[in-house]
From Swiss-Prot:
HAMAP family, alphabetized: PyrG
Protein name: CTP synthase
Gene that encodes it: pyrG
Annotated segments matching region Amidoligase domain: 1-266
Quaternary structure note: Homotetramer.
NCBIfam families: PRK05380.1, PyrG
Binding site for L-glutamine: G352, L380, G381, M382, Q383, E403, R470
Enzyme class: ligase
Origin species: Shewanella woodyi (strain ATCC 51908 / MS32)
Superkingdom assignment: Bacteria
Protein role: Catalyzes the ATP-dependent amination of UTP to CTP with either L-glutamine or ammonia as the source of nitrogen. Regulates intracellular CTP levels through interactions with the four ribonucleotide triphosphates.
Amino acid sequence: MTTRYIFVTGGVVSSLGKGIAAASLAAILEARGLNVTIMKLDPYINLDPGTMSPTQHGEVFVTEDGAETDLDLGHYERFIRTKMNRRNNFTTGRIYSEVLRKERRGDYLGATIQVIPHITNAIKEKVLDGGEGHDVAIVEIGGTVGDIESLPFLESIRQLGVELGRERTLFMHLTLVPFLGAAGEVKTKPTQHSVKELRSIGIAPDVLVCRGDRAIPANEKAKISLFCNVEERAVISLKDVDSIYKIPALLKAQGLDELVTKRFGIECKEADLHEWEQVIYQEANPTGDVTIGMVGKYIELPDAYKSVNEALKHAGLFNRVSVNIKYIDSQTVEAKGEEVLEGLDGILVPGGFGERGVEGKIFAAKYARENNLPYFGICLGMQVALIEFARHVAGLEGAHSTEFQKETPHPVVGLITEWLNEDGNVEQRHETSDLGGTMRLGAQLCHLEEGTKAAAAYQANTCVERHRHRYEVNNNYKDRLEKAGLVFSGLSSDRQLVEMIELPNHPWFVAGQFHPEFTSTPRDGQPLFVGFVAAAAAHQKRDLG
């Protein structure tokens, strides 16, 4: 199979939405019957985002094979059917690490290691490897043209453009075309300068996607085409929209997919965007709304919970309701108690690390349990629910996780020291292990207990979800917690680890050790999120009734 490559760069400012644009183009090409994948090349020195602060970088998206990756890979999976893996995201740090490891082994036979050719060759190998087996590979370059950090990546894709030729490569550049209120017009000069910067390093863009708060007039498109040496039909206007799922249709309406397929000489069917039209219709026509309180510690940056936010919206589509998310700092819950939890239709406690605010999360679980308020716990959200139940129902005073209190009298949650991976291999970690890359990561099979809400949600006796954690339920307390009324509704493939818990006599008190948000899409939803939002809508009706 001959893979074609589309390289996506950004200029003028950061946060233009390269990832959304790349994913939207991929969605159209997939709708034309093509096998598409997307890669993200990140210019930072970290090996991966695994140990980066969520308030700086946003969430860490976990792939099926256990890679800790950039949140843009979540966008990719929500827009196309192709599942991402560790080949779809790599950083400057990872490239340098691998090159230096080869140098230590003597693979370069004593050569002087340089950015060109050794680093650029390593980048090219990663890109070609990631695209193998697909009709089209879209490669997003992180950062902004002009940043010193991005230069090795830009040089690498420049070389690939020469080596693979125009028949197999296309360069798409996102720029900002701002509207100046005082002048009453859009300004194209930033775009011209951005393209000039890109051309100065040897890359001539084939397509310009011009971002702005409004559509770009035809005369301004012609001006951009003239001064940037790009065909006028290849100047695409991408205005701000109220839903990212409208973007595939916007790009298709301007013929971007047709331009790409003709450039590559690919004969394929017309794009059928019916599924996306259905998503947009459901989003625009809810029959009601619910308010979900998300109790977390990284709420100052909503992108820290990006996949959770999107999964709640997807669940709203399947329940025909609009989901309003109220972000609640768990430390505020510690200070003010139930005052900040009143008026909610459901409480969700997402994953997280560290002791700060954990008692607020435990209080939120207690409030939901005692007030029959739908509760959904994810990862740490499951652990705090179990701790709360142990303390206040099972009579285990002082129960806690050893992550937060080493000398707790009842360590109901403890460090996992050994577990089976999906391939059957044993993974191990200890108290002194590195933080990075030492968690239970990736897709794991979960056995669901018959007659539970979990099994009813999935309509199956097993599920496969993705994990990212170091701590688990202490099996020494299972019998006592079960006798107190807690149901262990999901167990690991070897039935040694607790994956899900729930309360049987509660409208919806369900929690999982895994991260179901990573598998939610607008077209398919995710069973637990759909069930949780349905319970929240039912709770609201009971209150109104």
